Amino acid sequence: MSYVSGFHHITLCAGGAQEDIDFFTRVVGQRMIKQTVLFDGRYAHYHLYYSNANAEPGSVMTTFPYNRVPGRPGSGQVSSSAYTIPKGSVTFWEEHLDRYKVPHGGIQERFGQKYIRFSHPSGLQFDAIEEGADTRVGWVTGEIKSDTAMKGFSGTVLSVREVAETERFFIEALGFKKTGIDGNLHRFEIGAGGPNRTVILQHDPDRPSGSWTFGAGTAHHMALDVGTDENLAKQKDLYEELGYTDTSEIKDRNYFHSIYTRCPGGILVECAATAVGGFARDEDPKRLGFQLLLPPWFEEKRKEIEAMLEPIQVPESNRAEGHAEAILADVNKAAVAEANQAAQGKFSHRASGNEFVGGDKR
C-alpha cells in the first residue's frame, strides 16, 4: 500500500543567502514563506523556504545557503527540480531568463512536454515544464503574471548509474508506477500522475557519484507527502519490512515531521507529514518570510545564531497584501499550541544545549 500522495518539498544547498533570495523571488517568481535555520549540526545556516501563492506542500522549495563548503554534483542526486508552468508560457520563460542573464538550455521536449532548463547562481538546475492540467495558484510579481507563473512542482529528475534497484524502490516502497521511457529517461508517477506526482530517473552509467554532505550547488533531498503522522509511522514500518533498515527516526522539523532513507541509487528521500498549522503556524499568513523564526528548542540561542548569519533583505513585494491569489487562511493558534504540547518527547530533534561553533558569516 502507498501512503505517498505526491511531493511535499525539495531541499537544495545554495551559495549566498541574499543571492538565493533574489533568484527565487525575482527570477523564479516564488513567494518567500519562511526564514529559519538548519536544525542539525553545530553550524548556524539559514533554512529558507519559497512557495506558490498558498504555501502548499508540493510547491515548497527550501534551501540551505552553504557558502562554507562546495558540493560535488554527480549521480546519486536530484539533478534537476521541475516546476509546472501554464501551457504556452515556455517562450515567456525563455525571454524572462534572458532578461536576467540566467543560463539556460533553450526550449526542449521530453515525454511530449515542452520545457526549459535553467541554472541557479550556485549551479543548481531547474526545469520549467508546460502543464495544462495544473490548477494550483502561482505567485504573481511585477513581471510574472498568473498566466505565466510557476504553479508548483512537476517533480524531480534523479541521476542514477543503474536504474533497476532504484526503480524497485520507487515502485515497492513508495507506490509509484512506471509510465514511460524517453531515451535515457525513465518516468514514474504516483496515483493519477501529472503535476506534483512525477519522478524521472536519468540513467547516467558513467557519471561519477556526487557528494552526499551539505555543499553549495547540490541537491540535499526530495521530500514526499504522506499526509499524516500515522501514515508517516506506517511508511517507516514499510521501509523496515522491505529491508530498508537504515531509515531515520521520526524527526520534528517544526513545520512538518519526517523520516529519511537513501534509495539504492543514492538519492536521499524524505517522507513528510505537515504539522498542525503548516507553514503559517508561527507567523501572520500575510507576512510570511519577513522574520527569522526559530524552533522552541533554539530560542535560547537566538542572539548567538543571529550573529553567525549573513544579513539579508526580503523584498517588499513578498507581502501578501494586494495579492488576491494569496488565500492562505489564519491559523488556529490554540490548535498549534496543543499539537506542540502533544509532540513533546514524541519526535527527535537536536538538544538545545549544544553549542554552535560557527556559521556562514564566520
Name every feature range the model reports, one short phrase each.
Residues 2-74, 87-103:
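Active-site-proximal cofactor/substrate-binding loop regions of enzyme domains
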